[in-house]
Amino acid sequence: MSSKAKKRVVLPTRPAPPTVEQILEDVRGAPAQDPVFTALAPEDPLEPLPRAEDSEVQQEQIYQQSRTYVAMNERLRQAGDALRQKFDGLRQAGQRLEQDISQVTSATS
């Protein structure tokens, strides 16, 4: 039997999405230990304090992140300045174009 002769399987229709009330009822009925609520829960405060090496590594990571942030912020500021200059140039070109159009229109009248 060839693949063209096979019958297509008809899938059941997709159910309607739940309403807001149904979602809220489901969330309210979930136990406190549900993974939805525990996945983002704060970590256990009884964990041992980090070692000095871990703290130094973390400080270095934070320092590097802050350097990256400052550099990206500077690039963003420069890009904003360049965009502003290009906008002003386009606005001036548009004004010149409107003047030229009005001159051509008045010259042909």
From Swiss-Prot:
Q: Which residues carry this modification: Phosphotyrosine?
A: 63
Q: Which superkingdom does the taxonomy of this entry point to? A: Eukaryota
Q: Which residues form a coiled coil?
A: none
UniProt keyword list: Phosphoprotein
User: Which InterPro entries does the record match to this protein?
Assistant: UPF0449 (IPR028227)
UniProt cross-references to Pfam families, sorted A to Z:
UPF0449
Q: Of which family is this protein a member?
A: Belongs to the UPF0449 family.
UniProt-recorded name of the protein: UPF0449 protein C19orf25 homolog
Source species of the chain: Rattus norvegicus
